[in-house]
Amino acid sequence: MTKPPYRVPSMAEIKALPWNGYRVASTFSGCGGSCLGYRMAGFRVVYANEFIEEAQRTYKANHPNSFLETRDIRQVKPEDVMEKAGVERGELDLFDGSPPCSAFSTAGKREAGWGKVKTYSDKSQRVDDLFFEYVRLLDGIRPKVFVAENVSGLVKGTAKGYFKRILAALREPGYRVSCRVLDAQWLGVPQMRQRTIFVGVRDDLGLDPVHPSPLPYRYTVGEAVEGLPAKGDAKQLKPGTDTHRYWVATKPGCSLSDACKELTGKNSFLTHVKQAPHRQANTITQGTQQLYHWTEPRTLTLQELRRVGGFPDDFALTGNFTQKWERIGRAVPPLMMAQVAKTIEEQILRCVA
């Protein structure tokens, strides 16, 4: 297969796509990354829920005419979702959710965060129970298919015990469930980003859950940002600072930690990486100073970040620089979710009478 040039459709192009006849209700929608992926695949998002205010503003800026539920998910009843979605129990085609996952992130201390109130984005709350709130709604709505997304750290270490609880809870309402760790770099995204994807199919449909197959090619960060201006919203590294010195001494594709250790003896800057244009970008996180350009002493610009995150160039980001970076860092890459959605449509939903 010939590798096509890297390109993400514009917001106008996505909104003009014909509806494939299938409806999605989304929870923990964030800025709308997964919702955008479903729209890229031709689905209609008939319900979305997001509790974080800045994420709400970003979602509304991009989908001003779409319904967005802003209450805490714990206050939402299955009947609320079905009423807004215009469906009866058992009619919804796909129920999506990305419960907050920082307690299980491989970049954090997974088990230490269980059962505790912690800061998630702009809110302080318990987040380790939210997956079960998703299951509560799933049980009440009874969609044909569900997709639940989380970090890859959910299936690692002693977090596996929590993973098994989630898997059992997802199967309890009567679903065949499959779980895989998918890497966005094999699904059209120029970024190394592993996510745990649960796909469930209602038992009475008699079909097994499916996941997308890897594409036969990958895109590099250099290909993704080609044609973009070098100037833009970015954090500049000031000459004379430690970070600038480490950046100068670091080769593309390497962490600044080696230079830090050599110059100071300290083991720091482990997640600060100078990107290599011939490779995929490192995982975008909520931190603003982790992905550096290979020739310019700065972070990636927000426009470059959109490209690396699989978002349209004209996708609106609200808030300050840190909040804008966080929105992309927390989002499911739309191009990745589009591949998941297309596979489900072709191999499951089209087979259901």
Locations of regions flagged by a protein language model:
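Conserved SAM/SAH-binding beta-strand->alpha-helix loop
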Residues: 52
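Class I S-adenosyl-L-methionine
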Residues: 39, 56-60, 67, 79-94, 102-274
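C-terminal target-recognition/interaction regions appended to catalytic cores
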Residues: 237-353
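S-adenosyl-L-methionine
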Residues: 1-41, 55, 61-87
